Amino acid sequence: DKEWEVVDITEKAACFSTVNLYLRNAWYHQAIKQFIDQGEIGELAILRICHMTPGLAPGEGHEYEGPAFHDCGMHYVDIARWYAGCEYKTWHSQGVNMWSYKDPWWVQCHGTFQNGVVFDITQGFVYGQLSKDQTHNSYVDIIGTKGIARMTHDFKTAVVDLRGVTQTERIEKPFGGKNIDVLCDLFADSIETGTRNPKLPLIRDSAIASEYAWTFLHDAYTHDLPAIGELETLEQIWERRRNMKNGYGLLQKP
């Protein structure tokens, strides 16, 4: 309710406002979107998004933002909606209560948009938490009626692979992080010109992403929700992460 109260206030105000839905500002998503808009993959049909890392473990302090599928997953819920260009229509979520924690820390949701585009979103901070050498699996795989566009990254470098009807291209550039600089440039440009840059996300977009992320997460609770593993393993994960110098999503020590 508070989210929509903010939306109402900002939309009635006579000033620009925005929010950092940072994936929209990522160079790789912009490149893929342009490729799709050029008709290179035909009609957009399938959106597949995955983000699995040994990141923030349950109980480490982000619960006020919700379990992982809301705290982190809402950004992937948003970017799927951004690509589809319309609202969600149907969904089904499956979760796993890893280490027998009370909330699912891995969720996959699949369904459809109102225009018929099919999606699946997989998110979880459960990927090899106690592996000797940690890794992750993060990708976007977009399938059209004629071609494809996909992306992978290692948090340092992003690689975009474009296979269209007239173009084949591989682009490799620095990953880019949270893209605050891009957001600031777009906002400054809007102020200077007096016209809102269409690339700026609306506060409404954030509220919608948050609402659907909660909806998809809650849907997982309505289906079989296996509890796999033991809390003792989670305690080992906490201990390891407390002492890690280089890891995924480590909390800042005071």
Which positions does each model-derived feature cover?
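Contiguous beta-strand/loop segments that form the cofactor/metal-binding neighborhood of enzyme cores
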Residues: 71, 77-157, 174, 181-196, ...
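Glycine- and charged-residue-rich phosphate/anionic-cofactor binding loop of Rossmann-like
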Residues: 167-173, 190-208
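A contiguous active-site-proximal alpha/beta segment in oxidoreductase catalytic domains
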Residues: 1-58
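Residue-level signal for the nucleotide or nucleotide-sugar donor/cofactor binding architecture
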Residues: 27, 71, 137, 178, ...
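Short glycine-enriched, charge-decorated loop/helix-capping segments at active-site entrances
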Residues: 63-67
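Alpha-helical elements of Rossmann-like donor-binding domains used by nucleotide-donor carbohydrate transfer enzymes
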Residues: 5, 27, 31-34, 79, ...
